[in-house]
Every structure is written in structure tokens, then in C-alpha cells.
């Protein structure tokens, strides 16, 4: 391997360091594979139970009436995630869009939205209206309240109890850490939180932002009481093949409203052409457990590499994993740029490009992003990003195969090593 890695620009010293780290990860990788095997069987059973056949891959145009493949895919998602219904559409452009649909469809003027997990992901601030924006929830008369996490990253149950009131209509729970240096929540933790909230107010809608968490465990938040789970098809469930799309799975009453919000009242799920995307959406979902396992191995490897070098990493090298994201606190903008340039240099697409920080819509500071992906913005593919602000943390995720994720981490280390920012 030394020769081919050398041709990619990875030195013998960096490769050797990676191999030392890798020797201790066999047991962790076996556990990841066991989860993937279970989830592969779960997806397979869902497809068989819904009698997926070759006609499901035919696309539709125009209104999209009688699109059997589109409708059956939604049944597959609902069965796999244990929900009454699902909305799985290429017309949902990204995770933020899916969340905006779910929120705006199920909140009316006078209702209150509660986040019991602190500040949401940056792009949702515009959706909610905490960063003023046209068409935000707050502009339409929805109020917002949030409860900060405890210092150790756990839920502040007394404060949550106090925050829930007669106006509380929907509780949003972000599973993954986003651009925060806090733990990602396990499905079990989310289930305990939902049970606590439902005990106080049984009719409240509990929605989980499931981005980056699908198929990391053998159960999903929908199996522990979530009324809706929401995600993006260019993350885990698309398996690297879905070129666009998002999903919302949950109670029929919630999904019906989401479908009306996506299209129009009275139209709902009856319209929405799938064009020629059905095959990719089915095949990507089928491959997702295996692709997610490769990304998880990459995250575990990254945690152990950078922890061994003395950096703060979340999760650490031995903690259980609840999403595919690995945060590394690098301490400087220079180190963030070097890390991301290494990830970009390891990409199959745009490997010659040098990522630099820039202003992105929805973010309140410059952001650097590295992603030489087949699908623009796909974070199940090898990618890294982060806001250029203290403590200068970079967030690594993805890799369509474990071996590509490994190469990306080694290349990120190579760039830091070349700039004298780390010593091996």
C-alpha cells in the first residue's frame, strides 16, 4: 500500500501512524458490521413485504398521478422505520427544507415550538425566525422557546417541564450535534425525553431531526415514540445514489399535513412526478446500511487518529456512536483549512480544488466546506466542513466506502503534517 498511497500524496510516516491506530479498532468495526447486517435485513424485508418489482422503477412526469413506484417507496420507508405513513420526494430539496415543511405544516399562529436541546442547526434559525427572515414561523405568529442542555450535554428535565405550557404544540429534537461541540443523542435518550414530554402533555407533537443518524443503530427515533422523523436523501438513507430528496415519516395525520404543505391543500401526495429517479432512490435506500457502516468506520478512525495526536474529539475514540459525524477541535482557522484541503485532495471529483472559507446562505459566519462528491452537497460522501469561529472545530462525515473514508483521514493528517501543525 505504501507505493499507491505515495502516489496519492500520503507519506510513509502518515500511513504508518494510521496503521498503528487501526490495529486497535477491529472489535469496534465488527460491532458496526453487526448493526449493518441487521439493518440490511430490515430494509430487505420492507422491500419484500411491499412487493417491490421492476415496474416501480418507471418514472412519471407532469402531475405525477398514479406513480406506483413513488407511492410504494413511501410505504417501504414507513414499514422500515415503523411509522403509519411517509413522504419521500425529490421535490424536497434538502434536510432544512424537509424540516421547514414538517414544522410549518404542523404549527399554526398562536402555537409554540419548543427545542429542549438548545439552539438548533444554523440554517433552522431563519426557518424559525430567531434570525429574522421573511416567511419564518415567527413571522406567521408561531412563538419559540428553547431549553439549554446541562453542562455535561444532558437534558435539563426540570427546565423542560417548566417550559411546556398550554401553547406548546410541537417539540423539535435535533439528534445530531450540528455545529455544536455536544454529544449526539442516542435513540434511547431520545425515547426517554419523548416519554417525559408526553407525560406532561400527551397531545404534543414530538419531531426528531434524524439527519446523519439513520441506520447507525438497529432502531430509529420513530420506534421510541417520535411522531415525525425527518431527514435528507443525500445523507444516510440515499446510500450515495439519491441525487436529491428528503423524507418525513410519522403519524398519518402529521404526514398528510406535510404533503399539503409540500404541494397544496387538496393535492397532497397525489401529485409530484418522480421523473427517472425511482431506481436510484430504491437502490440507494437498499445500500444505505452498508454505506452508513463505512462512514461510521471512517468516523471512528478519525476520532482515534486525532485523539492520539492530542486533539479534543467528539465523540471520543471509545464512545458509542449515534451518528456519522466526527467533530475535531483543531484550535485555529489555519488547521481547519489544512484539514479540509486534505479531504478535498482525497476526493474523486474536484480533487484539484482548494477549499477556502466563504459566506454561505443561512450561516452567520464564514464556513469552509470540502466535498469532492458525485452529488453536490452529499454528506454521506467523503466531506468535512465547519464554521470559522472559536473553538475552530471541523466536522468530518461520510465516505461511500470505508477505504475511501480512511484515505480521506490520512490525507487530512498529511496536510496538517506538511504545514507543521501536528507532530507524528
Question: Model features per residue range: what roles?
Answer:
Residues 74:
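Generic structural marker for isolated residues within well-ordered, non-membrane alpha-helices
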Residues 4-29, 33, 43-49, 53-56, ...:
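Conserved PLP-enzyme active-site core in the AAT-like
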Residues 36-40:
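Acidic, PIN/NYN-like endoribonuclease modules and their adjacent C-terminal/linker elements
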Residues 87-88, 327:
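Ordered hydrophobic segments in well-structured contexts
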Residues 307-424:
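Conserved C-terminal alpha-helix-loop-beta "cap" of PLP-dependent enzymes
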Residues 59:
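Aromatic- and Gly/Pro-rich donor/ligand-binding loops
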Amino acid at each position: 500500500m505504501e507505493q499507491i498511497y505515495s502516489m496519492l500524496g500520503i507519506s510513509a510516516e502518515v500511513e504508518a501512524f494510521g496503521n498503528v491506530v487501526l490495529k486497535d479498532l477491529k472489535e469496534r468495526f465488527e460491532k458496526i458490521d453487526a448493526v449493518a447486517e441487521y439493518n440490511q435485513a430490515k430494509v430487505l424485508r420492507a422491500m419484500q413485504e411491499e412487493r417491490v418489482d421492476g415496474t416501480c422503477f418507471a418514472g412519471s412526469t407532469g402531475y405525477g398521478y398514479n406513480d406506483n413506484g413513488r407511492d410504494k417507496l413511501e410505504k417501504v420507508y414507513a414499514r422500515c422505520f415503523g411509522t403509519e405513513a411517509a413522504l419521500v420526494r425529490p421535490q424536497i430539496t434538502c434536510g432544512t427544507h424537509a424540516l421547514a415543511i414538517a414544522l410549518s405544516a404542523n404549527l399554526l399562529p398562536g402555537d409554540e415550538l419548543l427545542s429542549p436541546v438548545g439552539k438548533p442547526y444554523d440554517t433552522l434559525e431563519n426557518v424559525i425566525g430567531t434570525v429574522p427572515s421573511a416567511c419564518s414561523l415567527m413571522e406567521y405568529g408561531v412563538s419559540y422557546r428553547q431549553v439549554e442542555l446541562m453542562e455535561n450535554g444532558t437534558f435539563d428535565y426540570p427546565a423542560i417541564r417548566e417550559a411546556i405550557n398550554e401553547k406548546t404544540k410541537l417539540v423539535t429534537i435535533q439528534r445530531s450535534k450540528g455545529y455544536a461541540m455536544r454529544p449526539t443523542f442516542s435513540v434511547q435518550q431520545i425515547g426517554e425525553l419523548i416519554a417525559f414530554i408526553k407525560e406532561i402533555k400527551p397531545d404534543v407533537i414530538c419531531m426528531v431531526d434524524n439527519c446523519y443518524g439513520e441506520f447507525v443503530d438497529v432502531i430509529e427515533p420513530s420506534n421510541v415514540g417520535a411522531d415525525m422523523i425527518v431527514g435528507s436523501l443525500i445523507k444516510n438513507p440515499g446510500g450515495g445514489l439519491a441525487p436529491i430528496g428528503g423524507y418525513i415519516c410519522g403519524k398519518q395525520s402529521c404526514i398528510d399535513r406535510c404533503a399539503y404543505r409540500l404541494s397544496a391543500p387538496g393535492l397532497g401526495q397525489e401529485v409530484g412526478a418522480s421523473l427517472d429517479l425511482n431506481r436510484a432512490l430504491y437502490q440507494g435506500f437498499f445500500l444505505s446500511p452498508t454505506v452508513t457502516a463505512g462512514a461510521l468506520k471512517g468516523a471512528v478512525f478519525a476520532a482515534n487518529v486525532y485523539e492520539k495526536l492530542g486533539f479534543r474529539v467528539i465523540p471520543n475514540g471509545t464512545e458509542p456512536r449515534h451518528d456519522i459525524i466526527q467533530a475535531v477541535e483543531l484550535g485555529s482557522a489555519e488547521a481547519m483549512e489544512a484539514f479540509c484541503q486534505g479531504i478535498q485532495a482525497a476526493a474523486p471529483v474536484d480533487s484539484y480544488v482548494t477549499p477556502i472559507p466563504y459566506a454561505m446562505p443561512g450561516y452567520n459566519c464564514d464556513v469552509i466546506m470540502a466535498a469532492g462528491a458525485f452529488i453536490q452537497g452529499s454528506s454521506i460522501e467523503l466531506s468535512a466542513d465547519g464554521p470559522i469561529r472559536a473553538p475552530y472545530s471541523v466536522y468530518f462525515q461520510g465516505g461511500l466506502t470505508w477505504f475511501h473514508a480512511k484515505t480521506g483521514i490520512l490525507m487530512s493528517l498529511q496536510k496538517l503534517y506538511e504545514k507543521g501543525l501536528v507532530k507524528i
